[in-house]
């Protein structure tokens, strides 16, 4: 079942995907292709003389506008008459075309979410995405323009700040009266035209058909229903108010006109000041803005126009053409304006529309038979700079219009005490939005919701200082023909309107028209002068560039000539050096050739001399060889004779030697027998001597022992006697006893050191000599500090020899063994040296090295020898 459902839905899903794909291709891919095609066509149609349109400006080419904050200008209001308006502010304003505004606001309209009825309205107009050129093209606009707009009739709605606020109040009080006024001022079609409409259309020579799209709030539905005579749809929640760019500028003109009218009223009666009230309504909380806001800080929610439209030279030329055409139209319309100015003001200025109202008013261009058809439906664009130049002219005319407007509204509006005055922040917001629309728009106009009605008792007028600041902002941001010493007038408007005489009103209109014509002539003169000045500057710049190019070319030629000259100098110097080197080389070669020839001659002479010397030497050698051969022959003969004689003598000698050998053999045998006998006799004598010596030694030992015993007895007796004497004289002679004791101790030490026991042995070398007194070093008191027992002097051992080593037989055996050493290898065999690693199970590198800390070469006394003799000083003989 699920498979069947999936198969049934498959065509629907495929159709949806295909529709999405086709929509994406139409909206994105084809749009890009069309735009690329248009840009390519424009590029190939410009004869390659225009600058690239799609290339952005570098940061150095961008001329960003820098405005002062309104709060910063408040403190400078008193210095405005003395200060000069900045030319940079007027010169840096870029020309913003009406087509750019319409495209920007159309893009905003495309991005807004519309309801169901708004979608129906958008389906009647353009619904698909457009390229930048299509949005800018006037052909698309001609499709939705009504027929009466193409036939010279231009319905105009002029909306000022005060009119908008009064209209909000009137919507709630007298909707029916306002509806009648709307229908009277704006006819529904072109069939029932009135003189007011034609005069209003003629009094507004709009050079460009631009549209300003303002979103609407639901509070203006009633007003939209009353305007069904010139609307396409009636019950739409979100529609647009389409105003011309010229009309946006006229809002400020109306403000300035009202300022002039109120200032005239201020001259007649004193101004009234009111205090602040905490109950003053200030409108919606969302629509309020701070006065201290940055003009550049608001994020823009609209899309920028393309760089091709912004920086195109073709568009600049188009704008210049449209400006000139607009001037000619103004000249032609001037007499007509003079005749129908009053009716045009009543028809165009009596309309009061709030800012958020849904109204569609399209401003078409005036009929110009000389312009091509493209300019008819596209409209003539005028830059902001040209509009701001003419703004002073429009202020005079709109001031007169305001006078008639106030008189006509007096019959249908309640007294002005019941009208709401614009609040502090709403006035700032309105002026900021107007300036943004004129400057090309850093951000879109914010949505305004009308404030709730408020009784006149709660309305608080703004301070005069704030109004001064607003007027100053207008003067600073709008370049006009205001003099340097112009006086800032008050914005304060009283509740009671002035009553104007119709003749005075007509006179003022004529005067305003005359001033406007004079200002137009002055502006044209200034434009011509500026044009001439720019042409002169361009000519000077061109001449300067040509001069610089010529200078650079001359400089390059000079550098090239200088370089060639240096190269020629280098080549000449190189040739000169080469020639000099070649001459030097030839001279050296000649000298070398002469030296070589001389050497060859000398070598030839030496060779001849050597040849002669070799010949002489060869002759001498031959003579010497001949003489040597003769001598050798003689010597050989003498040798033979001498050898014969020697052989004879040797033979006789051999015979004699044989006889002598026999005799010597006999004598040797006799000598051997005699030696054997002598050895036997000598051995017997020696044995007898040893026995005798042993007997004598025993006797000597016995005598020594007996003598020693007697000496010990005597010593004991002497000691007893000495002890007794010492005890008797102990009390009397203590110092003498101490001295004697010291002397005895010293003598005892000397006896010990000089004891004959060390030198009294038979084997000692000093046996028959007197002992030498030891040499005592006073620094170490005779002590050998660098030695131990192993370094005792063997000639004078410090330890006594034991009794077992002092026997006569032992000494004789030692002497015999010393002179006749036994063959140890024959007696005991080869003794292998022990391996200490195997015995101690350790391996040390210093087993077979002497590791004693003693200094073996240091003698005990300074006069002793470092190398000792044989042990016991025994010498071989």
Curated annotation (Swiss-Prot):
Effect noted on mutating residue 804 to G: Disrupts interaction with AURKB
Region annotation Interaction with CBX5: where it falls in the sequence: 135-270
- Keywords, comma-separated and alphabetical: Cell cycle, Cell division, Centromere, Chromosome, Chromosome partition, Cytoplasm, Cytoskeleton, Kinetochore, Microtubule, Mitosis, Nucleus
The record lists the membrane-crossing segments as none
Stretches of Low complexity bias are at 339-351
- Basic residues biased stretches: 62-71
Q: Where is this motif: PXVXL/I motif?
A: 155-159
- Fetch the InterPro entries from UniProt: INCENP_N, Inner_centromere_prot_ARK-bd
Query: Does this UniProt record's set of keywords contain RNA-binding?
Result: no
Report the outcome of residue 840 to A: Interacts with AURKB but fails to fully activate AURKB
Polar residues composition bias: which ranges?
119-134, 272-283, 384-403, 744-765
Extract the ranges annotated as region (IN box).
Answer: 781-823
Q: Where is this region: Disordered?
A: 47-142, 178-210, 248-459, 498-548, 572-695, 707-805
GO biological process: what's one of them? chromosome segregation
Q: Where in the cell is it found?
A: Nucleus; Chromosome, Centromere; Chromosome; Cytoplasm, Cytoskeleton, Spindle
Q: What is its main location?
A: nucleus
Q: What does this protein do?
A: Component of the chromosomal passenger complex (CPC), a complex that acts as a key regulator of mitosis. The CPC complex has essential functions at the centromere in ensuring correct chromosome alignment and segregation and is required for chromatin-induced microtubule stabilization and spindle assembly. Acts as a scaffold regulating CPC localization and activity.
Q: How does it assemble?
A: Component of the chromosomal passenger complex (CPC) composed of at least BIRC5/survivin, CDCA8/borealin, INCENP and AURKB; in the complex binds directly to AURKB via the IN box, and forms a triple-helix bundle-based subcomplex with BIRC5 and CDCA8 via its N-terminus. The initially reported homodimerization is questioned as the SAH domain is shown to be monomeric. Interacts with CBX5.
Q: Which family does it belong to?
A: Belongs to the INCENP family.
| Domain free text | The IN box mediates interaction with AURKB and AURKC.
Protein's name in the database: Inner centromere protein
Its taxonomic path starts at:
Eukaryota, Metazoa, Chordata, Craniata, Vertebrata
- Gene name of this polypeptide: INCENP
